[in-house]
Swiss-Prot record:
Oligomeric form and interacting partners: Interacts with CDC42 (in GTP-bound form). Interacts weakly with RAC1 and not at all with RHOA.
Keyword rRNA-binding: no
PROSITE patterns in alphabetical order: CRIB (PS50108)
Chain's gene name: CDC42SE1
GO MF annotations, alphabetized: GTPase inhibitor activity; small GTPase binding
Membrane protein topology class: Lipid-anchor
Name of this chain's protein: CDC42 small effector protein 1
Subcellular location per the Swiss-Prot or TrEMBL entry: Cytoplasm, Cytoskeleton; Cell membrane
GO biological process: phagocytosis; regulation of cell shape; regulation of Rho protein signal transduction; signal transduction
Keywords: Cell membrane, Cell shape, Cytoplasm, Cytoskeleton, Lipoprotein, Membrane, Palmitate, Phagocytosis
Ranges of Basic and acidic residues composition bias in the record: 63-72
Superkingdom in the source lineage: Eukaryota
Region (Disordered), start-end ranges: 48-79
Tissues where this protein is expressed: Widely expressed. Expressed at higher level in T-lymphocytes, dendritic and whole blood cells.
Amino acid sequence: MSEFWHKLGCCVVEKPQPKKKRRRIDRTMIGEPMNFVHLTHIGSGEMGAGDGLAMTGAVQEQMRSKGNRDRPWSNSRGL
């Protein structure tokens, strides 16, 4: 009898787990923004193609002057 179970065990292979399908996100799953503070606009004229990222420092300085830097969501690192 034990020989039967031994032979049966070598033929039974564990099936791989099916991959979980990612749920598609729709509008009902997204809430309103929290703690949103509008600081400034950056338009295409302000960040010209010739300037590259040279204007980044000026934009950062403008954003710093707009409000409190001690917010919990504030990032102290530069771009």
